Each structure stands twice: as C-alpha cells, then as structure tokens.
Amino acid sequence: MSYIKQLQNNHSSLDNSIALIDCNNFYASCERIFNPKLMRRPIVVLSNNDGCIITRSAEAKKLGIKMGEPYFKAKKIIDKNNVKVFSSNYSLYGDISQRVMETLARFAPDIEIYSIDEAFLGLNGFENYELSTYCSYIRRTIKQWVGIPVSIGVSSTKTLSKIANNLAKKNKEYDGVCILKSWFEINEALKLTPIGDVWGIGRRLSSFLQKYNIKTAYDFIQLDKGWVRKNMGVVGEKTFLELCGVSCIELDLIPSDKKSCCVSRSFSKPIEKIHNLEESISAYGTRVAEKIREEGLMAESMSVFVLTNYFNRKEKQYSNSIKLQLPFPTNNSIKIVKRALQGIRKIYREGYRYKKAGVILYGLSKSSQVKGLLDYDRESSDAIMNTMDRINGRYGSSVVRLASEGIEKSWRMKREKVSPCYTTNFDDLVEVKT
C-alpha cells in the first residue's frame, strides 16, 4: 500500500492551517493605486534598463504578452493595444510591500515574509473562525487599507498552500480564496497541478519524473516514499511529504541573519573610461551602505566587481573582482566608497566596454554588537550618516551624495518610463485640489 493511501486510510490529521497570501501582479497593482485611470487597462513593468517584461497585468496576459519577453519584441502588440508601460520603481514597490506585510501582521501572530509580494500566515488557533470568512476579511482589508488585490490559499502544509493559492488566483469561482482542508479537496487539487508547477520541483526534477509518466502532483504522491528518497534525496522527500499533508517546512518566523548585501546594476550603455566606473562604484557603494544602515548592520569586508557584455561575442570579454578588508566594521558610506574606489582602480583594464559593476559587503553584524579599539570616530560617523539619511529620506534619494558619484551620470540605469515615488518622496506626493 502506498504511503498516501496509508495516511488517508488512517484518517491522518489535517488540522494544521497555513495560509499563503500572494499579491496579484504586484508591480502592476502598485502602479494602479495612485492612478485609477489604469484600472482594466493592460499594464507591463520592465526590468532594469527597460530591457524585459517582468510583470504583466491580467489584461496584458490576455493579449499574449509573455513573461521575460524583451520589450522591443513586444512593442508592436503594446502599441496596438494601448498597453501602459512602466520602468520598475523599486522604491514604490518596497514601500507598498511593507504596508501589506504590516497589515497582515494584524491578523495572525505567526508571519513569514517570503518575498516582496508573498507571506505565509500560521492560522492555527483560528479554527473557531470559519477560515473562508476570515481569509475573505483579510483580502478586503488589504484592498481597502493598501489598495493591493491578493489571493489566499490555505492548507495543512506550505507546499499545499502554494497549490491552493495558485487555484485561488486562476479560478474566479474561488473569489480569491481557496482552502484545501480535506483529503478529497487535496486530491482533486493535485490532479489539476502539473508536476512542474509544484513548489520545490524544478525543471530538472520535472523532466526526470515525467520519464516515469509522473505528470501531475497527484501522480507523484502515489509513489513509494523510499523510491522518492533514493532518487530525489532529502529535498525531494520533503516535497513529497508536504504534498501528502505532512508538514516538513516550518514557518520561518525569525529571519536568518544576513551574510552579505549587494548592489549592482547593468549600465544603460557600455562604459570605457575609468572615471565613469568610479562614479558608478561610488553610487553603488553609497547605496549598499544605506541598505545595511537601514537594517542596523555593519560590514567587515567587501568586494568590487566589473564585467563586459558576455552576450556580445563581437567584443573582447573581461571580468574581474577583488576582495577588500575594511579597517574596522562600518556602515559609513564615505569609508566604504573610499575602499571600493581603491578596488576598482586595481581591477580596471583599458580597452574594454564594461556592461555591469557592483559592490558586495560581507561579514555583516548588528551595529550594537560591534565594539573595537579602532572604532574611535563611531559617534561622529553615526551623526553624519544619520543626517545624510534623514535628508535623503525626506527630500529624495541622492539629494545629499558624495562628490565621487558625479553629477550627470550618463552611465545610469535606463528608466525612461518610471512613475513617481508617491509614498517615499515629498516632491512626488499626490496633490488634491479643492
């Protein structure tokens, strides 16, 4: 008898309740919040340098616009159908994401922020509520308070809640909420789920399983558990057990400590001169320092890297990086940029057209835990950085910046269709006329 049949025959418990809340077409939905004219109009959002399509509204999907498609290839369909195009606006999306997560935290004590537009909620202890009603209330509240539509899937494991969420998103009859809490409901959902769509089953494992005529998630759970462990390892076995209703992936309520932090960008056009590279590295060093300050962290070391366009085989190729030790743990932009500039000057080579560069910080630890004899200017350093962050936070990013970042920044990432930063820049606040 198969493992799943044993569980079902023994009426194994499905009492555990995990909800996955996923924002629908998140970037496109963010753009609609402050521009009601975009409701029901097709929208696409572009990747860095306005290269590829990374988000499509439901209306854009119906037009046949593909995820990851280069913008220039889709431009004919876009122009013909009056599709609204946006450059990615991560300041806006990050702030809206934070508002969604803060709202979700009001509904359950156990929350795992999984990505910018997804979170798991532990709903154990809420069984006295009718789950469907409670989840519908969550949806309405997020829409009313933040303006973002969400889909919610609930089941006994994370993997099953992912499947439930996918059904809620794709089938209107669920009205945005799908709950799989019985063996019958789970079996029917698994029959509708291609094996390649299962969380934890990548392209390689999907191809492997299809050789054995395993086409759906339901086919997968009919396998022998020992066979799965032998052929797919511990990770495959966990996915198998999760689909069988056995929770193996706990909610990550305390995010693991960050080990590194990176800021890198592709340039709008290739860079050849060292002074342009120095400007870009200064800007990235400043931004990565800001990011760790926001999280109350300091870095012990760093690396700087550059590379040419690997896909342009007509040009000479070069890539390099250098690891650098900081004099003492710091999050001071001036010190980090100074060290980064030393690094870029060492790895720069003339005669190449550089496409991308970046700065990575390592050895991150909480500022409160860092104490050292050499950290003699900590108080002064903190005061300067706090003032800089406060001004930039109020009046817009890079209002106060290091001179080494330059002024014109011809290399800057292409963002020709970016929307205003409605929630993070005073100059972009929506004005209401009476």
Regions found by a protein language model. Give the residues of each.
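Short Gly/Ser/Thr- and Asp/Glu-enriched loop/turn motifs at secondary-structure junctions
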Residues: 114-118, 155-158, 297-301, 352-356
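Short conserved micro-motifs at the rims of enzyme active sites and ligand-binding pockets
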Residues: 315-317, 369-373, 413
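Short, charged/polar surface micro-motifs in flexible loops or helix N-caps
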Residues: 26, 49-52, 309-312, 364-368
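DNA-contacting surface of Y-family translesion DNA polymerases
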Residues: 11, 197, 207-353
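Short, hydrophobic beta-strand segments
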Residues: 119-125, 320-327, 366-372
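Gly/Gly-Pro- and Ser/Thr-rich, intrinsically disordered tail segments characteristic of DNA damage-repair
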Residues: 1-241, 250, 378-434
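C-terminal hydrophobic structural anchor segments
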Residues: 335-394
